[in-house]
């Protein structure tokens, strides 16, 4: 399985580098894939980013709504890494050429 995880990490890395979307990797992971497998893939690419000089500045928490968790068949929030080159200040323009499929999500408190 570790070879498959490495291959999936490489596909995601190349997608980010080339700013080109790829098909979901879940079919390559197989039905036995776990959330832990997904975090291994994330760890591989986090290590790669840190080794290339990117600076980790925080984390992005997702799936915080129980309703959304149920919709997606999970039972807890997930998280991803936020690097300095991904963070923008209030009112700062975000260059669209740096994003693969830009979207906006409202966070209502």
Where are these regions (language model features)?
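Active-site microenvironments in enzyme catalytic cores
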Residues: 2-109
């Amino acid at each position: 399985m570790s070879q498959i995880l490495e291959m999936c990490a490489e596909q995601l890395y190349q997608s980010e580098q080339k700013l080109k979307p790829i098909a979901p990797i879940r079919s390559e992971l197989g039905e036995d894939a776990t959330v832990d497998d997904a975090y291994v893939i994330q760890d591989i690419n986090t290590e790669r980013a840190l080794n290339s000089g990117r600076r980790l500045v925080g984390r992005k928490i997702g799936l915080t709504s129980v309703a959304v968790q149920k919709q997606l068949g999970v039972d807890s929030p997930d998280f991803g890494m936020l690097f300095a080159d991904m963070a923008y200040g209030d009112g700062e323009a975000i260059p669209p050429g740096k994003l693969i499929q830009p979207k906006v999500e409202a966070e209502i408190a």
